[in-house]
Amino acid sequence: MKKILFILLLLVINAYSNELFTLPDESNFLKEKIRYEILSSKESIFIAMYNFSYKNIAKDLIKASKNGVKVTVVLDKSKVEANDKIYNFLKEANIKVIIPNDSKKMHLKTMIFDDKLALIGSLNFTKKSFENNHDLVYFTKDRKIIQKLKDIRAKFE
């Protein structure tokens, strides 16, 4: 009986460890989830985002940074122009922004919150992506996935 209860408990915990959002249908729910995770983070937030122009997310990252959270953003160099608004907005707020200087496209769309929760998907952080595109975003607490993402993060830092 104890074994069955333990297995059920693990299943319940696992059910809440993974969430899949489909866009554009669940766009508003996803925006709230991302905002909640950013503002609830205590230690660190890592983002690797191919295209990032959504200012509300940038504002939340700045709030988190001002609350002592280490925020690191990796952007693709082809998407960051000299006068890029989000890039400058984040840099002016002392957010660590990395632009890889290699020949490969930085096409990732991922986040890690406090090294405990990961976002993986096809979504760029643009208004168009949230409202007009068919995209998927998956949240997971799977340790193996998070470790792989941390290994990717280490390549950029």
Cite the ranges covered by each PLM segment.
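Sec-dependent N-terminal signal peptides
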Residues: 4-13
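Boundary at the C-terminal end of the N-terminal hydrophobic targeting segment
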Residues: 15-17
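A general structural motif
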Residues: 24-30, 54
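DNA replication sliding-clamp ring fold and its partner-interaction surfaces
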Residues: 33, 37-43, 146-153
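Primarily the HKD phosphodiesterase
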Residues: 36-92
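Solvent-exposed loop/turn segments at secondary-structure junctions
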Residues: 51-55, 77-81, 103-106, 117-118, ...
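Signature of lipid phosphatidyltransferase scaffolds
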Residues: 117-157
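Ligand-binding grooves and catalytic loops that recognize ribose/phosphate and carbohydrate rings
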Residues: 81-112
